[in-house]
Amino acid sequence: EILRCLVGSEMCIRDRQKNESKGINMNNMNINSAIADTLDIGNTDTEKKTGLIGFYNYTVVLTYIGMWIGFLGVMLAIKDRYVGSLICLMLAGVCDMFDGTIASTKKDRTRDERTFGIQIDSLSDIICFGVLPAVWVFCVTPKISIAFTAIFVFILCGLIRLAYFNVDEANRQAATAERRQYYLGLPITSSALAIPAVYLIGEFTAIHTQTIAALALLIIGICYVLPVKLKKPSLFGEVLLVGIGAVEFCILIAEVLI
């Protein structure tokens, strides 16, 4: 009888140890699962569906198209197709005008998708509204030494502005869902209107395009990083800017056709 009690007691102890071991394993699994969920290990949005790095839905397609048009403008400037290059600059501006609106229609965007949209838009902007205007001015002012200084300042200021904007926009979106009410400094996309205007002023006045192009590029670049608050245009302001752009675009198209 005593032996039976001892055996039974030993079996109870073993069962208790097994249950405790199972409990510890379950706790470890729960902890590991919580850590994986927090770090999002093995389940990143960038690896879903396509298997490729990046995002390829409709929210970023217009940004990709704008970048391609901007690069085409760079190639045209190198080939001395200056008017065609300016047309590409303005078309890239149109793409940039609507890509944010299109992206906002996707209400279920993940945090990664929103962050990617900000980054890819800025990278596209530096090509379209930084490199393209700089290459255009370099090609039309090859013999003016100030052009090199203007080009360097313009690209550097544009790059700094876009990097700062990315940081500021990420902080703003984390704090509020409201739309931006003002810009700090001149938006880099302003070159889509300013550079064609410089060309047209040179074409229809006695001022040489080579003289004003480098100076305008230098001034625009400095304005990119000036800590001046510029309120976003009202509806009237937007219509006015679109109207100015439409006039510039039509004149450039007419020059190509004629």
Locate the predicted segments by residue.
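Membrane-embedded alpha-helical segments that form the functional core of polytopic membrane enzymes
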Residues: 61-119, 150-155, 216
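Basic, amphipathic juxtamembrane/active-site segments
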Residues: 100-144
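Cytosolic, membrane-interface loops and tails of multi-pass inner-membrane proteins
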Residues: 38-50, 98-115, 164-181
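Transmembrane alpha-helical segments that form the membrane-embedded catalytic/substrate-channel core
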Residues: 96, 155-168, 218-231
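C-terminal membrane-associated helical module and adjoining short loops/tails
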Residues: 18-19, 27-44, 173-258
